[in-house]
Regions:
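Short loop/turn motifs at secondary-structure junctions
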Residues: 45-46, 154, 187, 274-276, ...
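N-terminal active-site segment of His-dependent metallophosphoesterases
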Residues: 1-68, 150, 353-356, 361, ...
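Accessory, non-catalytic peripheral segments of nucleic-acid enzymes
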Residues: 232-390
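A short, well-ordered alpha-helical element
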Residues: 35-45, 146-147, 259-272
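Acidic/glycine-enriched edge-of-secondary-structure segments
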Residues: 21-28, 126-131, 243-259
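His/Asp/Glu-rich metal-coordinating catalytic cores
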Residues: 48, 58-207, 211-216
Length: 390
């Protein structure tokens, strides 16, 4: 017997911190992740797909989004078994009721809106479902599992959405609690959980699958789904993680001091597998030449990856004498550069740093033009001399 366990699709999620083009691509990636889940389920010949809540990111997603989600599930013709989570709770009027009215839910998709034991004899499983009927509760909605009866001969599976107490980093006074020993107490063959967006093993029969498409800068194993194999009756299942997500999210903190630091950062950027979503915070010191190299490398990274966001506000610009000489700035402009250097050095003034960068860029643009004008002038002088000698 083989099952696929997934959760926290968050269909309809918005990405307000990103540029519109990137935000749209990240939202679309969540539909693509569901399509890949369907392919994985078909390739692995699973008996059913268990989806442990938060299928939708909000109750207010559009009708089109609802229809698109169920269309994305068509790649697997076996049973999909879903429960609502805190984002799409089974309220008196919910996104699930709207989906039913739209006729959007295919016949092979089962949405379990009420707690209970649901038998799927063709798949060989009985699902003890604990859907959320409100966004938050202080009660353990899986407590009734302990005394619930299920049909003989079927695997006894729990399906729930919440926070296993004492196991998660963010679970202090968290809503929707679940007892850590629930699988053992309730004699479950497996407890499929959602709500924690990373991959996490609670015990040999209790797992969080995490979200199939990463959406946060956390190194917690997001972007995967679980294939669960039951090989011997009464024995714990064999659980295998499969990569599903498209984008890897990375958050880097870098402190620069010497040229080799910039070299290493550029090498790291070039080695980052594409496509990625990168947030980069830089601190330390760099000269003008190093700053120019850094900006060029970031521009190239932006072209390779889905999103590159960087914060240079803590990076101090320390132009060297060689930097200033290369700009060929004298007179008033030279005095301005000296003043900006002093302001930026003494007061770590962000406005002075930005002005230095802008002025340096303008002067660099002027240098090729000046060289070109001098060359044209020299060519013209040579022509006049030839004409005079003719």
């Amino acid at each position: 017997m083989r099952l696929l366990h997934t959760a926290d699709w968050q269909i309809g999620r918005q990405y307000g911190r990103f540029a519109p083009e990137d935000a749209l691509a990240l939202a679309e990636a969540r539909f693509s992740a569901v399509e890949r889940l369907a392919r994985l389920a078909t390739e692995q010949a699973v008996a059913a797909v268990l989806v442990a809540g938060d299928v939708f990111d909000a109750q207010t997603v559009s009708d089109r989004t609802v229809r698109r989600l169920f269309n994305a599930m068509q790649g697997f013709s076996g049973p999909w078994i879903l429960i609502p989570g805190n984002h799409d709770a089974a309220l008196a009027e919910s996104v699930w009721h709207r989906a039913k009215r739209l006729g959007a839910i295919p016949t092979h998709v089962e949405v379990l809106l009420e707690p209970g034991v649901y038998a799927f004899p063709q798949s060989g499983i009985a699902v003890l479902a604990a859907p959320l009927t409100q966004r938050q509760t202080s009660a353990d909605l899986t407590a009734w599992f302990d005394n619930a009866e299920s049909p003989e001969g079927l695997l006894r599976l729990g399906l729930a959405h919440g926070s296993v107490q004492g196991q998660l980093a963010d679970d202090i006074d968290s809503p929707n609690p679940i007892a850590a020993e629930r699988a053992a107490r309730a004699r479950l063959d497996y407890l499929a959980l959602g709500d924690w967006h990373g991959l996490k093993r609670i015990d040999e029969r209790t797992w969080y699958s995490g979200t199939p498409e990463q959406e946060r800068f956390k190194n917690n194993g997001a972007g995967q789904a679980l294939i669960v194999d039951f090989e011997q009756s009464g024995q714990p299942p064999r659980v295998t993680a499969h990569q599903v997500g498209e984008f890897q999210w990375r958050q880097w903190q870098e402190t620069l001091g010497v040229d080799s630091d910039i070299d290493r950062l550029i090498e790291r950027l070039e080695a980052l597998p594409a496509p990625a979503v990168l947030a980069l915070n830089l601190a330390g010191d760099t000269d003008l030449a190093g700053h120019q190299r850094l900006i060029q490398a970031l521009a190239e990274a932006e072209a390779r990856h889905r999103s590159v966001q960087y914060d240079l506000s803590a990076l101090r610009l320390q132009p060297t004498d060689a930097d200033v000489a290369a700009l060929d700035a004298d007179g008033y402009l030279g005095d301005v550069i000296d003043e900006l250097r002093a302001q930026q050095s003494l007061h770590d003034d962000e406005a002075s740093r930005d002005a230095l960068v802008l002025l340096a860029g303008l002067l660099r643009e002027r240098l090729p033009q000046a060289a070109s004008s001098a060359e044209e002038s020299a060519l013209g002088m040579g022509t006049l001399e030839r004409e005079d000698n003719a």
